[in-house]
Amino acid sequence: MSIALLDINDSNLQMWHGSSHLQSPGYALLVDKQYRFGNPARAAARLQPRDINTRFWWQLSTEALQPALGPARHTGDLVHAQLQELHREGGQPQEVVMAVSGSMQRDQLALLLGIVQQCPFAAVGLVNRSVALGSLYGASGRLFHLEVQLHQSVICEMVQNNGEVQLQRTLPLPGTGLLQVQERLVEIISTAFIRQTRFDPRRKALTEQHLYDALPDALRALGRESETNIEVNGYRARINRADLQDAGTRLFESARDAMGSLKPEDRVIADPIAGLLPGLAERLPGLELLAADSVRSALEQQLDGLVQRDQALSFVTALPSLITTTAAPDIVPDIAPEPRPEVVAAPPTPAVAAKPAATHLLQGAVAVPLATAGTTLGQGWEIHRTTVGWQLRGAGAAVLVNDSPLQPDQVLGGGDSLRIGDGPELRLIEVAPQR
């Protein structure tokens, strides 16, 4: 019996169970007295604003729902319904380990556990998601995690003592959520449409929804290039990355104020969604983006210590640092992990010329830390650390390394460029530790 892993952040709830991976942002849409959640609900947010609720995780309580939304009495009913949908679509796991935000209050955690008791699965673990993520990194100084939710962002501060990552404090950043930043981005882009085409995509709900739908791909493109085109209803506007950098100003400034003056030994990590925000690298230099499956990786490696069967669940806010037992390339780049034992003896590994160290993958203007266990590159490929260095594994689109076809068992290092299929150029780099 496999345990499902549930990452609760309302900007993108995720569940992993066996080969299943579900993603479902915290949107609830009322359709004929029934609820739809996640991406289908988000796709109707501008079309049916009176039938949408996006606050039910953030404002989890048993107070009467205002404004009313169908048969739900309170936000707890909507949370219950989304959990049931995830359980149903995720293969109906019998047990779940949950990673939740440190911004959840004690009474909200108690209510969440009460809701889970009414679900067709058992919660066997409950952990602060920032601490779980922090255990993948660690720091000789302070470790900060920037979490972007729908209606606010959160800074969690942690320290590492005696090989354990411990939560110190949680600071909500009001008015800095994904929805507020999106609203500002759409405002800037709409102004560009009006200036360039005299067409205002926000005048009608349908074209406004189309603009919101186009936003993620446009931001990804701006992470690679300085300009991109956005097309809505046959009208096209040219958008410059620099024009959008002010949209995240409140978030970036609030995060800096919450962390205070950073010392060389301090470290800052952030949820992947933060990487879409223009200006991130310039306003928060040194910030490291988490991989998309970092929560899964952390929970899997910490699973034995998190599972609490046949007892009242405690909220875990301290975990062993995984880098004390797993060599991390961005911490100790010159030491390769020990080879795993093989059932069948392999032929001796031929000598491989030493490659320049690599700790990060440069994607446009954002440097993503490389994970020893593997970092997903897309289109069926990932890069992982072996006994001889960084190598690709997978099967998918054709791969070019330094503009030449990938060779079998090719070892990669700092300075090497990758291009998968028709995707953007990626480059392996070494980020020197701050001193």
Residue ranges and their predicted role:
Residues M1-V31, L136-Q168, L185, L215-A221, ...:
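Gly/Thr-rich phosphate-binding beta-strand-loop-beta motif of the actin/hexokinase/Hsp70
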Residues S11-A99, S226:
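Conserved phosphate-binding loops in N-terminal lobes of ATP-dependent enzymes
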Residues P71-L83, G177-Q182, N240-F252, V295:
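Phosphate/oxyanion-binding active-site loops and adjacent basic polyanion-contact surfaces
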Residues L83-V96, R195-K204, F252-R267:
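Phosphate/pyrophosphate-binding loops at sites that engage ATP/ADP/AMP, CoA/4′-phosphopantetheine
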Residues M98, S103-A192, P272-I273, E288-S297:
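Small-residue (GG/TT-enriched) beta-loop-alpha framework at ligand/catalytic clefts
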Residues Q160-R241, P272-L277:
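Phosphate-binding glycine-rich/basic clefts of nucleotide- and phosphate-handling proteins
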Residues R220-A346, Q363, A371-Q379:
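Helical "lid/coupling" subdomains associated with nucleotide-phosphate turnover
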Residues V352-R435:
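Forkhead-associated
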